[in-house]
Amino acid sequence: MFAGLQDLGVANGEDLKETLTNCTEPLKAIEQFQTENGVLLPSLQSALPFLDLHGTPRLEFHQSVFDELRDKLLERVSAIASEGKAEERYKKLEDLLEKSFSLVKMPSLQPVVMCVMKHLPKVPEKKLKLVMADKELYRACAVEVKRQIWQDNQALFGDEVSPLLKQYILEKESALFSTELSVLHNFFSPSPKTRRQGEVVQKLTQMVGKNVKLYDMVLQFLRTLFLRTRNVHYCTLRAELLMSLHDLDVSDICTVDPCHKFTWCLDACIRERFVDSKRARELQGFLDGVKKGQEQVLGDLSMILCDPFAINTLSLSTIRHLQELVSQETLPRDSPDLLLLLRLLALGQGAWDLIDSQVFKEPKMEAELITKFLPMLMSLVVDDFTFNVDQKLPAEEKASVTYPNTLPESFTKFLQEQRMACEVGLYYVLHITKQRNKNALLRLLPGLVETFGDLAFSDIFLHLLTGSLVLLADEFALEDFCSSLFDGFFLTASPRKENVHRHVLRLLLHLHARVAPSKLEALQKALEPTGQSGEAVKELYSQLGEKLEQLDHRKPSPTQAAETPALDLPLPSVPAPATL
């Protein structure tokens, strides 16, 4: 507790103990010790007896004086750190640290020593090692000091960052499995700036500060984890961290990260949920501006584009462009804006392969995607439009057409074999579901059972699909619709994929009251957890069981229905309609 006081020539408890051990008159010895080590103010001596009269212990008085002086000293240290020339103030702080460092383990004076170190841009290495070696001191020191320790100790920095990265991934996954189902409030609803205010991003931003070396370390951790897990949320964090530093005008880092301006432009697109022509040209300029010998930057750009928020924006923009092309009667290959969106999508989707192979080349786009798949997708839009127009015609002008209920075999094959085709196809499914287009949805569902990399059963797609299906709530009363959706799609994967099981239960928790009773009973049996099911599935299933019980209690029993007397009410007379 009194460590370091002797080094400064200040008497401590050990000195008092020694004095009392060797003295013959203890009271005189104590009085002398108090005189020598008390507050040496002549005016104070006459005032102390008043404190005694009020029963104020000397310890309380001295502690109060000590706290006041320590606060003044902390203010003075902060003032020194901001006064005069840099060289002079750092010299003063170094001298102060040299004199006070021996007190660093004394709890009452530790804040002063830590404050001095905090304001030094370069703490002597010897002292940093002493701090690092002592867990208590390391925990107590300011982040400014820790940065100096971390930049030469990647493993220690990794230990600090790792729990934050785990927390971030858990938060993202938790958001995808949110019990709230809504087309308006979903995973992609928060604006980029709002997302950057999250705890993990803010903590990482503070830990990095203006230190380029630490920033590079975080990026390396994110690349490594992305390669190890294929988890795209690490790509989101990479973009969010850079933009968080951008918000704080940390030019030391923003000017050296070659992805800064590209990310800034893309961030604006994500905010608007659309890539307009002007920004599309800017993004193209960054890609075209990658010089020979600097191709490695494509790895980072692809990671920025692999961020689900970027993929979502690019995919939504692609669907919008395709609709415009239909109305303009233009082919996909004749639209430079569409081709650029596809180029950006391809780079984002190829991020893992690009970084893993270390072959930094833009992935080749399949010609058939543009010449066959997209025109085929546009033909589905035309089928839909034609049918809707026909339904609005007077009865005598209507053609006897039924809505097409099959997909071209080649269309399904594209969804299975090409990632780009699959991504665009899935976003078209989301688009028609949001449009409450039941016919188009039922036509496309069989094609989603087998898709490239099971993308139709990915958490992001299922999160968006279940949210959009809320708009078709009335259709769940129809057994045919439920059979197509559940038996024909969801239940083909739920036994082997726990995430699908969870998403189906989320959907039923929200819409159970709308589902046809016979179908609901069958679904409850089909979705019963097995011994291998995780806690999340069991919990959701239990909640569904409770909801269904409440639903049963609300319904009148057959006997109650029979006992309820019918009310014989006279029919009101209705006037005959006037002849037209």
Curated annotation (Swiss-Prot):
Record's keyword terms, sorted: Acetylation, Nucleus, Phosphoprotein, Repressor, RNA-binding, Transcription, Transcription regulation
GO biological process entries: cell population proliferation; negative regulation of stem cell differentiation; negative regulation of transcription elongation by RNA polymerase II; stem cell differentiation
Gene Ontology CC annotation, any one: NELF complex
A Pfam family assignment: COBRA1
Chief location: nucleus
PTM annotation (Phosphoserine): residues: S557
Positions of post-translational N6-acetyllysine modification: K519
Tissue expression: Isoform 1 is expressed in the kidney, liver, adipose and lung. Isoform 2 is widely expressed.
Domain of life: Eukaryota
Phenotype on disruption: Mice exhibit early embryonic lethality. Knockdown in embryonic stem cells (ESCs) leads to proliferation defects, increased differentiation, increased expression of development-associated genes and the dysregulation of genes involved in signaling and metabolic pathways. Mice exhibit cardiomyopathy, impaired response to cardiac stress and the reduced expression of metabolism-related genes in cardiomyocytes.
InterPro entries with a match to the protein in the record: COBRA1
Subcellular location: Nucleus
Role this protein plays: Essential component of the NELF complex, a complex that negatively regulates the elongation of transcription by RNA polymerase II (Pol II). The NELF complex, which acts via an association with the DSIF complex and causes transcriptional pausing, is counteracted by the P-TEFb kinase complex. May be able to induce chromatin unfolding. Essential for early embryogenesis; plays an important role in maintaining the undifferentiated state of embryonic stem cells (ESCs) by preventing unscheduled expression of developmental genes.
Family: Belongs to the NELF-B family.
Protein name: Negative elongation factor B
Species lineage: Eukaryota, Metazoa, Chordata, Craniata, Vertebrata
